[in-house]
């Protein structure tokens, strides 16, 4: 039986990255639910398209056991994350990431996804692919220059243009 995936979409989210995951999951019969890293289900893509997703991240807290994997879908919200780190939805984001990681669930992400995983301490000793500008921020994991890395339960890609290099392995692991 296919696994169930919690997809985190920051606001704004990179639509190119988000929809690669969603379309691949849909086409392969993998169940997913999209959670806005926001206080509302209405978010935007980097290009301004309005999306209404399934739920908000606050409602994922405490329900981590209902999912087998977590996707962090990056976007323009990440470069300004530090300015908004104390917002309840970003506090929830970090708690949810840490909980999924500590439970050994599949951790999937691109661009700054590995950096967000690393901030929680769950990447210790794991090879991760991350956006080149975020590479110096990796303190626990091992940042590489590869387009994507798969190390244990971590599936990471440098950016939305390299998700395709890991997506077949992500789908295989989720089926």
UniProtKB/Swiss-Prot annotation:
Binding-site positions, riboflavin: 161, 164
Effect of residue 74 to A: Loss of Zn(2+) binding. Decreases thermal stability. No effect on the binding of flavin derivatives
Keyword vocabulary terms for this entry: Flavoprotein, FMN, Metal-binding, Nucleotide-binding, Zinc
Keyword ATP-binding found: no
Record-annotated disulphide pairs: none
Positions of transmembrane segments: none
Protein name: Protein ppBat
Pfam families: DJ-1_PfpI
Domain of life: Bacteria
Subunit-structure text: Homodimer.
GO CC, alphabetical: cytoplasm
Positions contributing to Zn(2+) binding: 74, 111
Role description: Binds flavin derivatives, such as lumichrome, riboflavin, FMN, and FAD. May act as a flavin storage protein. Appears to lack proteolytic or chaperone activities.
Keyword Protease: no
GO-annotated molecular function: metal ion binding; nucleotide binding
């Amino acid at each position: 039986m296919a696994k169930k995936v919690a997809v985190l979409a920051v606001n704004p989210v990179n639509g190119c990255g988000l929809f690669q995951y969603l379309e691949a999951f849909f086409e392969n019969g993998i169940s997913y639910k999209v959670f806005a890293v926001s206080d509302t289900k209405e978010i935007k893509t980097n290009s301004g398209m309005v999306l209404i997703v399934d739920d908000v991240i606050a409602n994922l807290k405490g329900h981590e056991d209902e999912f087998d994997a977590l996707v962090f879908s990056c976007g323009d919200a990440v470069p300004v994350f530090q300015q908004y780190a104390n917002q309840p939805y970003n506090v929830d984001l970090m708690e949810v990431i840490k909980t999924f990681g500590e439970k050994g669930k599949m951790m999937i992400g691109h661009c700054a996804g590995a950096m967000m995983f690393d901030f929680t301490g769950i990447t210790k000793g794991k090879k991760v692919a991350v956006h080149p500008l975020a590479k110096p921020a990796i303190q626990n994991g091992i940042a590489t220059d590869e387009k994507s890395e798969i190390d244990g339960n971590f599936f990471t890609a440098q950016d939305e243009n390299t998700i395709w290099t890991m997506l077949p392995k992500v789908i295989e692991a989720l089926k």
